[in-house]
């Protein structure tokens, strides 16, 4: 059992306890100002239940209240719109009617059928979080409020169709290349395999590189904010190619902290991933082509994680990049997050 407490500078301390958390996986979340905390991982529609204890600091004093309630909340915060939080899930349980607390009290709570349709996400301009909130209402003083976060991931089934990506691009009478990737949809521990084939080369190429780019879009309409991050970039060719030359591409996704692709989450934000192929000529002129790929979360059976299956269910979690941008990051501690082992690029376990 795990206890989390907070000293409010108020007449009581509040402690949360989750049921069945002894073997539950955790994820380490880095919040603002470098503060990190470990959150328990919940999958899909797993129930969220436990106990909350209210401990009075001074036994000789009582706490008058207008009612005690506990809520389970799913919330989206847009950092450019601070102060406005968008709740997409909210369930309330009344724990006690108006009265007095004269001694320590422990209440049980159970949110058995709560839908957690989206994954938790900490991004550059947006955060999606799930939390349990206790509120002790008071008439002549501010309410006592304590929130306790959990981390949610969702598994999805493998895509029914997953065709390869093949496209011919270039500059008329100067450069024509054909690039091909083995799939258009990849699970988070997959391997991207492809090749670049030169059909026509009449300019002097110095080198070619490929990059994996994450693009976070927040807002809607004219108020859309796009934030792009280069997760990795490396050179795949050095020197001038000749007609008929083929350059192999191999990119292991398991070494990066990725989320699945998110599309229009509650009409508030999206997260997409792109492969960016760039060629640079001897005049340092850059030619590039960007191709979107879809990422999804694959599920596996692992002991000690309630709710995990081997039915290849999957959908998205942590967000980190290998650049030093000042943002909220999620890092996966070793052996802590339920993800497939990196021993195959196949989509089935």
UniProtKB/Swiss-Prot annotation:
Record-annotated disulphide pairs: none
Pfam families associated with the record: Vps26 (PF03643)
Stretches with biased composition (Low complexity): 308-325
Biological-process GO terms, alphabetical: intracellular protein transport; protein retention in Golgi apparatus; retrograde transport, endosome to Golgi
Chief location bin: membrane
Segments for region (Disordered): 299-349
Ranges of Polar residues composition bias in the record: 326-343
UniProt-listed InterPro entries: Arrestin-like_C (IPR014752), Vps26-related (IPR028934)
GO cellular component: cytosol; endosome; pathogen-containing vacuole; retromer complex
Keyword Transport: yes
Membrane topology value: Peripheral membrane protein
Compartments where found: Membrane
Keyword entries, A-Z: Membrane, Protein transport, Transport
Keyword Isomerase: no
Similarity-based family: Belongs to the VPS26 family.
Subunit structure: Component of a retromer subcomplex consisting of vps29, vps26 and vps35.
General function of this protein: Plays a role in vesicular protein sorting. Component of the membrane-associated retromer complex which is essential in endosome-to-Golgi retrograde transport. The vps29-vps26-vps35 subcomplex may be involved in cargo selection.
Record protein name field: Vacuolar protein sorting-associated protein 26
UniProt source species: Dictyostelium discoideum (Social amoeba)
Gene: vps26
């Amino acid at each position: 059992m795990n206890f989390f407490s907070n000293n409010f500078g108020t007449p009581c301390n509040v402690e949360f306890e989750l049921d069945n958390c002894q073997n539950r996986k955790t994820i380490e979340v880095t919040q603002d100002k470098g503060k990190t905390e470990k959150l328990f991982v919940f999958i899909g529609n797993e129930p969220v239940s436990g106990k909350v204890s209210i401990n009075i600091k001074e036994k000789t004093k009582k706490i008058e209240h207008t009612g005690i309630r506990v809520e389970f909340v799913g919330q989206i915060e847009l950092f450019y719109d601070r102060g406005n939080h968008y709740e997409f899930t909210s369930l309330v349980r009344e724990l006690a009617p108006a009265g007095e607390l004269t001694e320590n009290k422990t209440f049980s709570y159970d949110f058995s059928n709560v839908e957690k349709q989206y994954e938790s996400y900490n991004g550059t301009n947006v955060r999606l979080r799930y939390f349990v909130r206790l509120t002790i209402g008071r008439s002549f003083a501010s309410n006592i409020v304590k929130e306790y976060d959990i981390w949610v991931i969702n598994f999805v089934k493998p895509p029914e169709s997953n065709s390869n990506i093949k496209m011919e691009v270039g500059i008329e009478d100067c450069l024509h290349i054909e690039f091909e990737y083995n799939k258009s949809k990849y699970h988070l521990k997959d391997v991207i395999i492809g090749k670049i084939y030169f059909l026509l080369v009449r300019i002097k190429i110095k080198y070619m590189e490929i990059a994996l780019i994450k693009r976070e879009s927040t807002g809607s309409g004219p108020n859309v904010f796009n934030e792009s991050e280069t997760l990795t970039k490396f050179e795949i060719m050095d020197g001038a190619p000749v007609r008929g030359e083929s350059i192999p591409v191999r990119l292991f996704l398991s070494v990066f902290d990725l989320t699945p692709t998110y599309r229009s989450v509650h009409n508030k934000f999206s997260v997409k991933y792109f492969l960016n192929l760039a060629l640079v000529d001897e005049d340092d002129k850059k030619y590039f082509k960007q191709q979107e790929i879809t990422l999804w979360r694959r599920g596996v059976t692992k002991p000690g994680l309630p709710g995990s299956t081997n039915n290849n269910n999957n959908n998205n979690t942590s967000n980190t990049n290998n650049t030093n941008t000042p943002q909220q990051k999620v890092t996966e501690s070793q052996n802590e997050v339920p993800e497939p082992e990196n021993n195959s690029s196949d989509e089935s376990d």
